[in-house]
């Protein structure tokens, strides 16, 4: 983590009392902004906070889905703490969501995703990652729409899991929902990502295409 970084939690000081989505304001415990290393090469983007992150305030923590992702980060050398920790010691990784507030009974609407887009766009610009990892179908569709020239409907996270997609300024490595991954799928992602980390991925910026 950057020596000048004061905190891993919401390090860019984003609005902690946003009211742009009235229905989500009624159901959330708190806003869950990004967390991690502001100088990270790897940005992981989920759809919305689950019950655990809504409680802890930290993306991908406090529940089984979060523990599954943190376990993978540990295998990749990006998490120096236990998968169950509510404040993981991330290095070279940043975690965030399309939407920052939880609704317990439904996924976010397109309008709610749009309302949160300025937060995600700002994080992408300030972190300037080398690799974006959309976690799940909705993040993959959203990231692909924004950062590739391929029609979003051509992406399927079950097929694109553990592959590398060339984007505009970034490479994209889709990940299936951590809770729905088989052991083989998890191993495939770790193997693919370790191979990616072992090459000079920092020279991929600016390449275009799918």
Predicted segments — roles?
Residues 2-210:
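A polyanion-binding, active-site-adjacent surface
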């Amino acid at each position: 983590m950057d020596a000048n970084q004061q905190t891993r939690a919401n390090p860019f000081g984003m609005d902690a009392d946003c009211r742009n989505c009235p229905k989500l304001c009624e159901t959330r415990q708190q806003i869950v902004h990004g967390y991690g290393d502001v100088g990270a090469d790897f940005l992981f983007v989920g759809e919305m906070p689950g019950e655990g992150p809504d409680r802890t305030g930290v993306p991908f923590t406090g529940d089984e889905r979060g523990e599954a992702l943190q376990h993978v980060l540990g295998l990749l050398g990006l998490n120096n703490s236990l998968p169950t920790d509510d404040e993981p010691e991330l290095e070279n990784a940043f975690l965030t969501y399309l939407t920052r507030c939880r609704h317990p009974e439904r996924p976010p609407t397109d309008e709610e995703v749009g309302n949160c887009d300025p937060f995600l766009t700002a994080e992408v610009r300030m972190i300037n990652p080398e690799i974006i990892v959309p976690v799940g179908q909705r993040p993959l569709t959203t990231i692909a729409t924004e950062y590739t020239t391929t029609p979003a409907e051509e992406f399927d996270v079950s097929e694109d899991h553990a592959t590398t997609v060339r984007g505009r300024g970034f490479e994209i490595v889709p990940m299936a929902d951590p809770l729905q991954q088989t052991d083989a799928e998890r191993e495939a992602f770790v193997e693919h990502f370790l191979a990616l980390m072992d090459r000079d991925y920092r020279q991929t910026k600016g390449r275009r295409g799918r």
